[in-house]
């Protein structure tokens, strides 16, 4: 096992006041606790081997919270903090840990998370062409092909026209 990509993502539309509180524990269970379990196991294994790459998929709203996804964004803030904590804990063992924070990607994520015209808006007309999943995969591949002594701790990948968040 050379690479682990932690891509836990359970979205939830709305902020603290408007999101469905019955879903809060599930969001944190998947995005934070579930991801942390995988990070622990991967970190333990890779520190024993003294090599490896761990890539965590966060979100731009984990750095710049949107009022339309404040609760989800808070879970991505949390996994970002855990990722950086793990990086500091295991970097001396030759294990690289990186956080990738995508902007808006064309996928089923928004529908499943409950976003609609009111809380998501017309992203294409506002931001232009949105990201395809391949753009994120290309960013991850770039991280992984850097020399072993180089670790890009964080990378934010947005559509060129996405000025918020």
Explain the meaning of each model-derived region.
Residues 44, 88-91:
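Alpha-helical segment proximal to the catalytic Tyr-Lys
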